[in-house]
Amino acid sequence: MSKVMIFLIKFYQKAISPYLGQGKCKYYPTCSQYALEAFKKKPFFKALGLTIWRILRCNPFSKGGYDPLK
């Protein structure tokens, strides 16, 4: 299942994200890169939870900044 998510994230990064413009994510690494690392390094459900939590935190009220995968 993680391989499917990795494929979908890479597809998003290459086919969709470039058309959204630069600098849309408040975090470093970007939310999609964070998710990609999570699905490569963590069990599926842990990675899914981390990814959802990260996306929920990426909003106009968040200050963003450096937030690496732990």
UniProtKB/Swiss-Prot annotation:
InterPro entries: Membr_insert_effic_factor_YidD. Its main location: membrane. The keyword Glycoprotein does not apply. It comes from the Bacteria. It is found in: Cell membrane. Keywords: Cell membrane, Membrane. GO terms for cellular component: plasma membrane. Belongs to the UPF0161 family. This is Putative membrane protein insertion efficiency factor. It comes from Finegoldia magna (strain ATCC 29328 / DSM 20472 / WAL 2508).
